[in-house]
Amino acid sequence: MPKKNEAPASFEKALSELEQIVTRLESGDLPLEEALNEFERGVQLARQGQAKLQQAEQRVQILLSDNEDASLTPFTPDNE
C-alpha cells in the first residue's frame, strides 16, 4: 500500500483505495483519530481522481478539436 501522502500509480488504483476507505468508514468500527485520517486520505484521493479526470477530458477535447467533424456533447450522468 502506498504511503498516505503518495498518489496511487493510476486512477483505477486511487478509485479502488477510495472505495476501501469508504467501506471502512461506513463500518463505523474505526476509532475517531483513525477515521479522521482515513477521511483525510479519502478527500486527497478524490481530489487527485478529479484532477486526473479533468486532464483526460482536456486531452479528449484537444483530440476532437483537430477533427472538425466531431462535436463535443456535455456529459450528464444519470441520477442514481
Swiss-Prot record:
> Can you tell me which family this protein belongs to?
Belongs to the XseB family.
One of the record's GO cellular component terms: cytosol
Name a biological process GO annotation: DNA catabolic process
Which EC number(s) does the record attach to this protein? Answer: 3.1.11.6
Print the keywords alphabetically: Cytoplasm, Exonuclease, Hydrolase, Nuclease
What the record notes about the co-factor is: Does not require a metal cofactor.
Q: Which reaction does it catalyse?
A: Exonucleolytic cleavage in either 5'- to 3'- or 3'- to 5'-direction to yield nucleoside 5'-phosphates
**Entry coiled-coil feature ranges:** none
One term of GO molecular function:
exodeoxyribonuclease VII activity
* Source species of the chain: Escherichia coli (strain K12)
Q: Which InterPro entries match?
A: Exonuc_VII_S, Exonuc_VII_ssu_sf
Summary of pH dependence? Optimum pH is 7.8 to 7.9.
| Disruption outcome | No longer processes msDNA correctly (when retron Ec78 or Ec83 are expressed in the strain).
| One family name in Pfam for this protein | Exonuc_VII_S
Kindly give the SUPFAM superfamilies that the UniProt entry links to this protein: XseB-like (SSF116842)
- Under which main EC class is this enzyme filed? hydrolase
UniProt name for this protein: Exodeoxyribonuclease 7 small subunit
